């Protein structure tokens, strides 16, 4: 909802419209208040737009409520009474209190930043006076009091300070570890330190592991002791991809997890995969007329088609198959081409020939 600016409406017509609208709203709210809560209320409104002041609920009802109000003692009457000046003074007092609280919060943040910068050696960047130093001292004393109170509470509860706080990491040199895994590794540590293992959980380090390591040329090619045996151990990397798959017996934990969900089914790959694909694809045109008539396609040469047919068709003794695009999803096989009777390709052509019945007509009109 748009916030209304509380100022006098300059336009007289708009001011009158707003007056009528809001007056009816006040009377409606008073009716709801007196009906729902069972209280006595009245309203008197004077306006330059109406000659006679308006009262609610009526003139008699307004007089009755006003007389009861005047019978009350002056202290009780002025306790909740407020005019415009009193209302504005109360708002100003609340605003000043909020401003004071915000100023104190900003000062606390400034002094805290000043303290941290002094710890970092940036005290020379500030222009401070005696009051700033006093505020800094108060801030430091506040933090010290909190730390001392925490220490005293721990001592009173019978707890040890070292047991409640995680121990500091103890750093030792790499040469003092004495593990065979580091001595056999192709990566040799020269200088640096590593963190010790946690006493409660030996698999977790208590701090950062920041060794300075240098590696020679053998560190790149030589296999380490833990990771390099997983993808390549006991696997024939030079096996023929067209041969049947050979499943290896797992020799370690990693090979077992790789092969435990595999079915031991061998698949015989075709000897010539591309030849089979070509035969399946180019058998679509077996029933077409390859010996096209020169009168149909004058630019078509028989010598150009023969090499393509010989290249993409299988040998004579091979098995011909009906392609999948003809609706043969089961790949039924035909008889070998050497057992099929010799059929003239011209008889299987779906194109009408220009020679034959229409020869006299063509010869007479050309």
From Swiss-Prot:
GO terms for biological process: positive regulation of transcription by RNA polymerase II. Probable transcription factor. The lineage of its organism: Eukaryota, Viridiplantae, Streptophyta, Embryophyta, Tracheophyta. This is Agamous-like MADS-box protein AGL36. It is found in: Nucleus. GO terms for cellular component: nucleus. PROSITE patterns: MADS_BOX_2. It comes from Arabidopsis thaliana (Mouse-ear cress). Interacts with AGL62. Residues 1-59 form the MADS-box domain. InterPro entries: SRF-like_MADS-box, TF_MADSbox, TF_MADSbox_sf. It comes from the Eukaryota. Keywords: Coiled coil, DNA-binding, Nucleus, Transcription, Transcription regulation. GO terms for molecular function: cis-regulatory region sequence-specific DNA binding; DNA-binding transcription factor activity; DNA-binding transcription factor activity, RNA polymerase II-specific; protein dimerization activity. It holds the Pfam family SRF-TF. Residues 86-115 form a coiled coil.
